[in-house]
Amino acid sequence: MRLAVLCSGNGSNFENIVRVCDQDQVVLMIHNKKECGAARRADKLGIPHCHIKMKDEDTIIQLLQAWRVDLVVLAGWMRVISADFIKAFPRTIINVHPSLLPKHKGLHAVQQAIDSNESHTGCSVHYVTEELDSGEVICQSREIAIRPDDTVETLTRSIQKEEHRILPLAIEHVKHEIQTRTYRHLLSDEDN
């Protein structure tokens, strides 16, 4: 299966995917911030990457199609993608989110968990739909205790450890689903 990973920041989830999943699976990484850690990691790992501004979403779609990408992984992609993007890749875009969905959707999920005096949080991997952080959940992490002295930074580090654990599991799950869906499609074509 051919993966593309979209990143905006440090790229630790991207690097983890490359290292844990078969290396030849990640064929491309796209980042929307020119000087980000993800680009440096891609250089170090020998993964092709390019910087594309999010307003150039059509270019991103065309590039993903040209690279024959089977699965798009949003790993720290800090932009909402459009309905057209989602329609171009139906049920083949997944996102890792730093909360136990459906709690704390959106950009500041870790801060929301702290502010709401939750005793625990975690992370989720879900299919991307037009409604923000509302797609079917593929898997969730173990609960992570929120300590009284936790800050957004310390809690984010704890959550990222779990993201590194569950994102490859979610990719394997989706890979199996895509293969099953393709096999069923081939069988139905043969029946006609």
Label each region the model flagged.
Residues M1-N192:
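One-carbon transfer enzymes
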